[in-house]
Amino acid sequence: MTELARRYYTAVVAPFDDAGRVDEEAYRRLMRYFLQERFRRVGGIIANPEAGEIYYLTREEKRRVVKIAVEEAGGKMPVFAGVFDLTTEGCVECARDAKAAGVDGLFLMPPAGSIDLVTMWNAAQYPEYWLDQIRAIDAAVNLPIIAHPAGGSPTAQWGLGVPGETARMICREVPNVIGWKMIYNYDGQRKMWKILRSLERPLAILAAGGGLFHEFLAHDVLDGTASGSWNYALEPMLDHIDAWRANDVVKARRIWVEGGLRDLHEFIYSDYSRLHLRYKIAAWLRGLIPNCKMRPPMPVAKAEEIETLRRLLKGAGLAREGE
């Protein structure tokens, strides 16, 4: 189970067609891109993550996306499925659908909806808000879990992520949790590294924002990833990681700085209200998906974002051929 967690999971975006439906053929093509030999050996798929707009998909659409991901992966790389519904019962049904489709594990995020559960949730004081739901899902399907702890009221200590003591409790009480996504602010991430390393069992630290991979690698805490950055910068990201793994810091820094990877990531992550849209814009500009449309009420791309990303992709050697 530890090896299952220590992979570079990509939070795959969901392409939509002109009518606003999930573009299944485009999704299959994107899956085949991720199945290229170099990534297949080390990577994994998260179908229906937050980046895949799971909050705005119907139950049948979620089923179809997972079914396609499992079909295309064909056992060559692991597939985890996002789970979301406004009710715990609905989340259990979603998890059962994913298990029936043959996924290797689940990608769980905190409850959403009421102000009680979202902006006002004190996760340190009331860990059961999420823990009870995780337990219900775990009891129903008994699959490995990657946690996406983006929930509750943001704090200066942790940023967007569920606080460290709550994370520790969840990991101790639910042995099926094998990986924890690092959705925290910089200081919070450093605290979480220590907390997760102090657990009685191995649990993978999964880097999220591509803009911090350099620090994760320097501290030797990049066990794996759960990141949407793979949607737009797979090749130089692998080069950068490989350089660090080979202890070639000079090469890693050259890829990161002179190679333009840092600047590309920094723009993508500079505005979290545009984050998942920018994943799609960049993937579209690279020719990996047919457009950058999101399902309303998600935002629409602005001309300046497109031009900035076009320039940054070119600077990172990722421009589409002919541009």
Describe each PLM feature range.
Residues 139-140, 144-272:
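Catalytic alpha/beta core domains of metabolic enzymes, predominantly
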Residues 2-161, 298-299, 319-323:
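Active-site beta->alpha loop and helix N-cap motifs at the rims of alpha/beta catalytic domains
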Residues 26-30, 61, 65, 90, ...:
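General structural feature for long, well-ordered alpha-helical segments within catalytic domains
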Residues 43-44, 78-90, 113-131, 147-156, ...:
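Hydrophobic transmembrane alpha-helix bundles
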Residues 5-10, 40-45, 69-72, 106-110, ...:
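Short amphipathic alpha-helical segments, especially helix-boundary/capping motifs
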